[in-house]
A protein has these predicted regions:
Chain A
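Charge-rich amphipathic alpha-helical interaction elements
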Residues: 1-143
Length: 143, 147
């Protein structure tokens, strides 16, 4: 659900600046997600887990495969956010209100997509943490 | 890092329902960070052998201290958010709504500012953890290849 402050949109420079700022924030967020994905890639394929855990490698492989899909989704969303910047800048050139409304709606849709992705990624990270956290190799107990 | 204070004028237009929704989002994010703290702490404390071998031990000690500080800050912020959520319930029942409403919005802005500041600091800490643990994992992999 989109809970944006319900102020009606009007295409003036101040509003465009607000949309651009929001767009920059999404970009920063997605850039950080990419860094997290890179780390998780390394983490899941490192030899840091306890030995002799049933199905450990199968589970890690499943996480790894899901992570590759998340990575692709993140890249795709980054491209959409990048391209959307030009749509926002183009709003000022709209000749009628329906054109402005269309691009504003696109903005809200993309906002929702970024939020949904963030939620999905957070859930995925929680699953990795709760499964792998207790399985980290305890140096003091294990050779 | 210096904490920038923003005015967030759009808060003036937010309905109580929207402010409540934001507060619940803060609460949920802070809950997630709490779990993440636990995970990172386990990782830094338990994954010691490669870290010792990679000579990153003192750096890891610093990160564990920073995690502890981050956890304390989180607790404070979490309490403020919880009180803020409860206050809205009281506010909706209060007759002197206008004055209380102004104060509530002011508090909402202050928490928003602190939440954003906290998130930025925490992101930096995560970046440092990724860098150090990433280095240790890579060095461990190289050693195995050369062994």
């Amino acid at each position: 659900m989109n809970r944006n402050t319900s102020k009606p949109f009007s295409a003036n420079e101040k509003e465009i600046e607000r949309l651009l700022k929001e767009n920059r924030r999404w970009k920063e967020r997605l850039t950080f997600f990419k860094e997290e994905i890179t780390f998780l890639n390394l983490y899941l394929s490192a030899e840091i887990f306890q030995k002799d855990v049933p199905n450990l490698y199968e589970r890690l492989q499943l996480f790894y495969d899901d992570l590759q899909n998340i990575k692709l989704e993140c890249l795709d969303l980054t491209t959409q956010v990048h391209n959307h910047r030009y749509d926002i800048e183009g709003i000022l050139e709209c000749e009628d209100i329906s054109c402005e409304v269309f691009y504003h709606q696109e903005h809200l849709k993309l906002k929702q997509k970024v939020q949904d992705f963030a939620k999905k990624f957070r859930k995925f990270k929680s699953e990795i943490y709760s499964y792998t956290g207790p399985l980290l190799r305890r140096t003091s107990n294990e050779p | 890092m210096e904490k920038k204070t923003h005015n967030y004028r759009y808060i003036e237009w937010k309905t109580p329902d929207e402010m409540h929704f934001s507060s619940l989002q803060w609460k949920s994010e802070l809950n997630f960070i709490k779990d993440e703290h636990r995970f990172f702490e386990d990782m830094l404390k338990e994954y010691t052998l490669p870290i010792l071998e990679s000579q990153l031990f003192s750096r890891v000690k610093e990160l564990i201290e920073q995690l502890n500080l981050s956890r304390k800050d989180l607790k404070l912020l979490e309490n403020r958010v919880a009180q803020h959520i409860n206050k809205l319930r009281e506010l909706l029942e209060n007759l002197d709504e206008q004055r209380e409403g102004r104060e509530y919005r002011k508090e909402h802005k202050e928490i928003l500012n602190d939440f954003i500041h906290y998130s930025r600091q925490y992101k930096r800490l995560k970046r440092d953890i990724f860098e150090v643990v990433g280095k240790a994992i890579k060095q461990q992999k190289q050693k195995r290849l050369l062994a």
